[in-house]
From Swiss-Prot:
Its main location: cytoplasm. Coiled coil: none annotated. It comes from Xenopus laevis. Signal peptide: none annotated. The keyword Mitochondrion does not apply. Gene3D superfamilies: Macrophage Migration Inhibitory Factor. Tautomerization of D-dopachrome with decarboxylation to give 5,6-dihydroxyindole (DHI). Keywords: Acetylation, Cytoplasm, Lyase, Melanin biosynthesis. This is D-dopachrome decarboxylase-B. It comes from the Eukaryota.
Length: 118
């Protein structure tokens, strides 16, 4: 059950209207998870500084069970997420940051329990 959070200082009108849907589909493909299990949040107009500059930028946090736990996995995922974000947002790669957060099943609650028991 991946959780993907995109923060950007771009304004709402500067990002594709269907960015959350596209990011959901891209995440499912990149991580090899069913689209129905992907959770996406997109926040625009956020006050952000990357590399000492408030020029247009974005940060993507990818949290998931089992598929973001190694450098090798994340290197492959990183290239694909960077391609998606540069294409969708028109940002240079040096204005994009990714953060991979491995999760354990007991850290995600759903249906009154945690994923460990589902």
């Amino acid at each position: 059950m991946p959780f993907v959070e995109l923060d950007t200082n771009l304004q709402q009108q500067e990002v594709p209207q269907d960015l959350a849907e596209k990011l959901c589909s891209a995440t499912a493909t990149i991580l090899g998870k069913p689209r129905e299990r992907v959770n996406v949040t997109v926040r625009t107009g956020v006050s952000m500084v990357v590399g000492g500059s408030s020029a247009p930028c974005t940060q993507l946090i990818i949290s998931s069970i089992g598929v973001v736990g190694t450098a090798e996995q994340n290197k492959e995922h990183s290239a694909k997420f960077f391609n998606f974000l540069t294409e969708q947002l028109g940002l240079a790669q040096d204005r994009i940051l990714l953060r991979f957060v491995p999760l354990e099943p007991w850290q995600i609650g759903k249906n009154g329990t945690v994923m460990t028991f589902l």
